Amino acid sequence: MAIREILTVPDPILKEVSQPVDQVDDDLRELMDDMLQTMYAADGIGLAAIQVGVPKRVIVMDLAGSDEEAKPRYFVNPVLSDPSDTLKPYEEGCLSVPTVYDEIERPDRIHIQYLDYDGNECEEIAEGMFAVCIQHEMDHLEGVLFIDYLSRLKRQRAVQKVKKVEKSKDRDAA
């Protein structure tokens, strides 16, 4: 397993639409293992493959709290359907938009179909934080970031803030 670099805005790769996975094999499982290790190292709760530069329809997630045992989840070729009419606001952040948080409204319940780590077909209803997180990560697979839901001014400020943070990190590393 390896920790991979997480791409940040305004990297154009983040705007690419991810492609379906043909099969769940050892190479894909290695990618998912790397993604999970990368997500944990960055203190995230979800990560899409495109965020590590791989345009495949793969998501890893772990919504366990810091005082709970890890509960990793894997979603290959996920498909969302039947969103609830009820929208709820949640404050979202993103490993690809570090230090930026804002409130986004999303359906609080949604149906999801996917392949798991072993390639088994699964389906379930996502609610609450799980629903928010899976929709956020699914947006990544379509080349959409949570800041795309914000006003143009807020989006520009977010990108500038990330550039400043990244520049500061580069200076500190030198």
Curated annotation (Swiss-Prot):
One Pfam family it belongs to: Pep_deformylase
GO BP terms: co-translational protein modification; translation
Manner of cofactor binding, per the entry note: Binds 1 Fe(2+) ion.
E.C. designation(s): 3.5.1.88
Residues annotated for Fe cation binding in this entry: C94, H136, H140
InterPro entries in UniProt: Peptide_deformylase (IPR023635), Peptide_deformylase_sf (IPR036821)
SUPFAM superfamilies the UniProt entry points to: Peptide deformylase
Cofactor: Fe(2+)
Keyword Ribosomal protein: no
PANTHER family found in the cross-reference section: PEPTIDE DEFORMYLASE
Record's protein name: Peptide deformylase
